[in-house]
Amino acid sequence: MRIDEVLIYEERLNAKPIISAAIIKLDKVFKDNNHEMRIVGGAVRDIALGKSPKDIDFATDATPDEMMAILDKAGIRHKPTGLEHGTITAILDNEPFEITTLRADTETDGRHAEVEFVKSWEEDAKRRDLTYNAMSMDIEGNVYDYFGGMDDLQDKVSKFVGDAEERITEDYLRILRYFRFQGRLSKPTWDNDTLEAITKHAKGLSGISAERIWQEMSKVLSGQNVASVVSMIEKTGVSKVIGLSTNNANTLKDKSNPVLALAQLDNSVDLAKRWKFSNNETQLLNFLIKHKNNPLDQKKVEDMIADGVDKDLVNTDAQVPDFPITGADLIAKGMKPGPEMGATLNKLKQQWKASNFTATKDELLNATS
């Protein structure tokens, strides 16, 4: 419904878990100076999906100069971390808060945008990519939804803000961002008009740097619904533009690490060169290819990566380590089979992982003494 010319979603979100005392104080400081501060972007989307946001971004109708004056007046430390973009970082209770002035695009070239500072929340929302990324929320949980983002989340569909072709041609990387976010939805619905716009402008990705392509594709490949998302990347012609071979969808399975996912593809080595993998990523890919026909080794590598092992340990000559403790070792130390033994084995395995898989059998057994 529209209240005071602002579209507010009919139900409040539960914002309490992320609203700290520092955020409440910052909000009051802006209000006391006749300005507004809201949570914007991905944090609002994640809360609406019942997820805990990793990062919280804030926006305000105050200009950077006004922000700094407001924070100075309140005795709050701050740093001009991105003045050209209108971003000030306020530091309160030893916690940084990035606050950005509302902006509107004045000029775009398919890769970057020139912006100007504005006072309109709706104008700022217009420059964002997808409807559910264009929402903002106050600390009470009121959602300001100008383009139907909440409805799209409920319908499990991703749509561009306003005209899809305009949003895409402003920054062609938005095509891959679309697929990345679509993959995050549970059993997503595909919007035909959006797919037509992507198909029409897929070639625009040829002007995007390899690093930016991989940055987005790595998130696509480590997300959910990878097979269905890649299938649609192929159907829209995007795969040909970015170098992804076709007919991969049926072979792809969801993986926690993008290199693990990419290793399933026939042209993974060529893609690694084209997308300019880091040295660590290249070493990991070569290792995975070397052990491709050994499912046991593959599983161990996946466990290692999932547990955060330093990728430097995984190189072309590496041997995948075996957990050195068995139930027989614990029985030999006098432990009886049962739940306690299982718990001890799990505890020792966690210690072994914490050592980057270097702790010896004796060291681990001594830890049980």
Model regions: which residues?
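Catalytic cores of the polymerase beta-like nucleotidyltransferase superfamily
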Residues: 2-369
